[in-house]
């Protein structure tokens, strides 16, 4: 008679533990294998912010703390892969309450700079050097862009602004905000002058890509006043570039969503959201999208100027 009572006590005492375990599954990842993508929301059904993995990558620096000395970053003569665990943030010159990490600069042979700016409550930008144009793209948070004329623009995630060289402006933010910024010394053509442009990716039309399968948007006009452009390129899983590109243009790339394999020269790199790539002129380059979600990357490209200039 004692055995049934003992079993009953064991089962009863285990019930609270089972409830706790079930609760843990409910609040954690549990058995859900779905990624919380912008489309599905994962198990919780709550959609994460756009480009959340660009600022919170799968292999974030915190995940690599138990691998001292390990990095996926690579620097070679004609290309570089800069991954998040290698980012070094420090105060940006003349900016207020803002940290920056320079990812690409003339020190590696580029004719432009590409950097991340992390703004916080009460932060404010500084102007670029004289003769330098700037493009700002919002990855996280929001900013208020003010022109010298007094006009203002609110930029949310996936919005951007192109500021011509020597145009006075300021950017402020009162929340945690991450920007990717491109700057280069403007190459003038007599009689042509670029204009201020404020826009968002989703407002840009899809462009024809003969012979290719990816979707392409361009953030700036293709006309002569503009000496560079920013391409937004989307690949579905399994899609890849048909052309194995070799050209005189330089590239600065930030992977906003997804993962895949990037060929640079004779090297093949697994890449994911948050990774940055520098491509020098004439380095062979090719990309294939892998995984379960689409790839989207942002790509700097110099255009509309004779390479001899």
From Swiss-Prot:
SUPFAM superfamilies: RmlC-like cupins. It catalyses: (S)-2-ureidoglycine + H2O = (S)-ureidoglycolate + NH4(+). One of its GO terms (biological process) is allantoin catabolic process. Keywords: Endoplasmic reticulum, Hydrolase, Manganese, Metal-binding, Purine metabolism, Signal. Residues 1-22 form the signal peptide. It comes from the Eukaryota. Its EC number is 3.5.3.26. Its cofactor is Mn(2+). It is found in: Endoplasmic reticulum. Mn(2+) binds at residues 245, 247, 251, 285. Its main location: endoplasmic reticulum. Substrate binds at residues 245, 285, 297, 301. GO terms for cellular component: endoplasmic reticulum. CDD domains: cupin_UGlyAH_C (cd02212), cupin_UGlyAH_N (cd02211). One of its GO terms (molecular function) is metal ion binding. Homooctamer. Involved in the catabolism of purine nucleotides. The sequential activity of AAH, UGLYAH and UAH allows a complete purine breakdown without the intermediate generation of urea. Belongs to the UGHY family. PANTHER family: (S)-UREIDOGLYCINE AMINOHYDROLASE. This is Probable (S)-ureidoglycine aminohydrolase. It comes from Oryza sativa subsp. japonica (Rice).
């Amino acid at each position: 008679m004692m055995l049934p009572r003992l079993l009953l006590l064991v089962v009863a005492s285990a019930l609270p533990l089972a409830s706790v375990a079930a609760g843990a599954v409910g609040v954690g990842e549990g058995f859900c294998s779905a990624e919380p993508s912008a489309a599905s929301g994962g198990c919780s059904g709550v959609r994460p912010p756009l480009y959340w993995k660009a600022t919170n990558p799968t292999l974030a620096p915190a995940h690599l703390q138990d691998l001292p000395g390990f990095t996926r970053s690579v620097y070679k003569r004609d290309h570089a892969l800069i991954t998040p665990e290698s980012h070094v943030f420090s105060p940006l010159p003349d900016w207020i309450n803002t940290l920056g990490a320079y990812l690409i600069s003339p020190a590696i042979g580029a004719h432009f700079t590409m950097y991340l700016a992390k703004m916080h409550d009460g932060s404010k930008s500084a102007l670029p050097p004289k003769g330098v144009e700037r493009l700002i793209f919002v990855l996280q948070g929001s900013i208020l862009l003010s022109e010298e004329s007094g006009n203002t623009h609110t930029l949310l995630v996936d919005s951007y602004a192109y500021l011509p060289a020597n145009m006075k402006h300021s950017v402020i933010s009162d929340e945690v905000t991450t920007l990717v910024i491109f700057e280069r010394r403007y190459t003038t053509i007599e009689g042509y002058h670029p204009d201020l442009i404020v826009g968002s990716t989703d407002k840009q039309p899809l462009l024809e890509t003969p012979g290719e399968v990816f979707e392409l948007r361009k953030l700036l006009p293709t006309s002569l006043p503009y000496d560079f452009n920013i391409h937004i390129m989307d690949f579905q899983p399994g899609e890849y570039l048909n052309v194995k590109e070799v050209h005189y243009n330089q590239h600065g790339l930030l992977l906003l969503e997804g993962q895949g394999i990037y060929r640079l020269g004779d090297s093949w790199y697994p890449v994911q959201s948050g990774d940055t790539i520098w491509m020098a002129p004439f380095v062979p380059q090719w990309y294939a999208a892998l995984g379960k979600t689409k790839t989207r990357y942002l790509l700097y490209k110099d255009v509309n100027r004779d390479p001899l200039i």
